[in-house]
């Protein structure tokens, strides 16, 4: 039986069905295929916004590539350095949940996805690519600077606002991991 969240999930409303035969290798963080990461990012951005340069979907998918190679890399520390497909840390999760739980986005998220931000718990990000993409997009939504149009500029943007000076990643790591994870192929299919 589908849960309330699954029944009200926008991708379910559009008769989207994951193709379990699409990729034979095991994915992590609840992802069935890399293509599904793009679909979740698109669904989230359809609700939250695509940004002025219409680059939010690219940024979210590239962030997932930089953080987990789009689900290919399983973090050996499931919650200490971040969790889920986009590796959101606990402090950031709590800040974003509290910031947006009474925002204009809250009723839309509840209607489209069945997500009540005020009741969301951190552990959900670990196995829900939808939740991971949502919190990734919410993190970037807090930034007043527009999302850049090029991958190189988005790499610097990711480092400054997402990975920050506390993170080990570099803009070059972002670019390299996007290539390793096959991000370009997701947008040419």
Model-identified regions with their sequence ranges:
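C-terminal/domain-terminus segments
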Residues: 147-168
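Long, charge-rich low-complexity segments
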Residues: 172-189
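Alpha-helical scaffolds flanking conserved acidic
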Residues: 54-62, 151-158
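Cell wall/extracellular polymer interaction/catalysis modules
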Residues: 28-30, 48-59
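Peptidoglycan-targeting cell-wall enzymes and recognition modules
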Residues: 28-43, 65-144
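Secretory-pathway/luminal and periplasmic proteins that interact with or process carbohydrate-rich
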Residues: 67-75, 163-172
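N-terminal export signals and maturation junctions of secreted/periplasmic proteins
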Residues: 4, 9, 15-47
